[in-house]
């Protein structure tokens, strides 16, 4: 069976379209997925990748389009799937082996990016300190006051790969938790899924925003447009979600999302209104202003605090996950602003 389902309400395909390859790794994987070629070819490509990168002291996997796209596709086999690609590939051992090798390099790069995360022993206090609003103007302030419609569209495109499936990867943590900690995550995620109302699902609200500004709301439609840094942020979350050993990081990542969302969402909504858009464009952000003000308390105190109390060995990983989320947000923000300052698009052309 292949992944080619349609959303029952919109008729939009729910699986990711097959993207254009960005190098030998992704070209090999796309060939395998499209033609059922020998999956061992990806292992051979991974061998060549490791040899080529081992002597390059300037190499940065976080900015490697080929490696990041390959990881994105390998993870996507476990999520919405890839259009007209057999679901049988999801647990193919050769693809899993190649993914594991790429993950080793990717995780090492994340650790280097984040560095040593200070810990006071009080995970709740540490999370509040890490996610406190910065004094600088930031991307959200620019979007509120100065961003053009085209710049808003670019931000939405970068965010779309995650927001059109919002909550799905974090939800993977539910089955790995128990008791009050599980209940806290379920409470947060229930709101993300609209409390049972499809029209109120946050992913659906984001799709409404995309349509309002003239963009496609198809899941993965802009996969070819986003650079490695965007895919790396997406892949870091998938890394945490698909590995039980990173349960703490998954929880910490969610805490960072929830605690840094309300104020920026208010500014994004203001920016869209400044540009003349109405509630069909702003409801996604308006909803997050209210919801995430509540979610942040549940996520930090009951979810992260509860997990650290019941499983103290996960405390450092909780902080690592939060720091990773913040670091990738900074990388993407820097990419956006530096591109615009040079009069360039932040998207691939």
Q: How does the language model describe each region?
A:
Residues 2-349:
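Non-heme di-metal
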